[in-house]
Amino acid sequence: MRPFKYIKIAAIITAAAVFASAFSGCSLINFFNRYNPSNAPTVAPKSSSGSAVALGDRKQTNSGYGYSSLGTDELRSLYDTIGEYMNKSYEEEFTTNASLSDFDFALGAYEADHPEEFWLDLNSRYSYIDYGFSFSFKLNFEFEGEQLSAAKETFEQKLSEITSSAPQEASDYQIEIFANNYLIDNCSYDNDNSMRHNAYGALIDGKAVCDGYSKAFQVICNSLGVECVGINGYCPEFNRENGESSDTGHMWNCVKIDGDWYHIDVTWNDGDAHIQRYLYFNMTTEKIKENHVISPLFADKKESDELFNVFVPECTSDKYNYMKREFVTLYNLDEDSELLAEFLAAVQRGDRYFDFLVSEDLDYQQTTQSISDYYGYKWIEAVNGYNSGGAQIDSETQFYTYQNINAVTFDIKYIN
């Protein structure tokens, strides 16, 4: 699979404002008569993120959707044979009556189910000899013998270390957040690393491209009992804008949370902008298709299709979309008590950022202009008043707008 070239997409920031001019001649800490701390709004409790499971009770899962996609006994037998030879210490040839097409399907299904088996050379996955009545295949490895054993041991130790650092008691949604954040904090996009296309590159080297991120994410989730699959596809519009071929491949994931499937693109979540960490976190199929093209299932692929999928769930729920779940939504500029409560809580925690969504029922540009002209000042005035005995917000505070996702971020500067 050809790598997807990752470019930081901080360009989603479309505007910024400094509130200093609005504060001219005003003290930010003397509004106690108007905003008495005793009247401060409180944050409403969020709905449950799902049933919490103790870390020690979490069991590894392998959903086996690749195997399940194989519709005949012959294909399933070929899948098992591939598994047998994938787990040998050295490359060995084996003979089968299967066609090249069937072999590609079975191998793709096996790879989809086993992202932890990182040693297949993805630049040349297999070689074969055509005998006319049968084929002799050999899977090509990145490592063999003692090197392979050592690499497996290193990988397993690292994976154990990662999963042991997961929250001691957490829902599947919280485990998903952990896996997303682990990769963002410990892996960087790198097109030069020889292991960039697999989970080893992401977890051991800390350097990978999209399929390395995706496979590592699947490995972490599956190891912690969260169903996760890889999705192959393209991002042609993004590729064209960045000088790439429109058919350059991309890979991301789907996860199953509380019975519903969601798309998540950890590679695109890894960037410079603060809010980008959760930009593509638990999206519907309709939403992800705005800039991702999902490759066809094997049965539907054309000869010209380089990539295919063995399983693509339909994702229709936005219950666990990170931004809709974690960010307060502004529905009316003059009915802002819920927003103020969240803003105040962020300041009391000492957070660097405060994020919220603008309702799709509001005109985004008009709303953010009103925030720049007046409401941003009003909210900071209110938070400083409500928090009179604690941290105070400085006039150098800025806000950033992300119109494509209807979000706003306050980059909070505190008075020393």
Predicted regions and their residues:
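Sec-dependent N-terminal signal peptides of Gram-positive bacterial secreted proteins and lipoproteins
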Residues: R2-I29
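Solvent-exposed loop/turn segments at secondary-structure junctions
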Residues: D185-D190, A208-C210, C235-F238, W268-D272, ...
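Secondary-structure boundary elements
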Residues: Q147-A202
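N-terminal accessory/pre-domain segments preceding catalytic cores
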Residues: V18, G25-A170, H292-N416
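A short, highly charged nucleic-acid-interacting micro-segment common to nuclease
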Residues: S99, A199-Y213
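Repeated polar recognition positions within modular binding domains
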Residues: E92-T96, N186, D190-S194, D205, ...
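Hydrophobic/aromatic-rich core segments of domains that either
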Residues: G212-K287
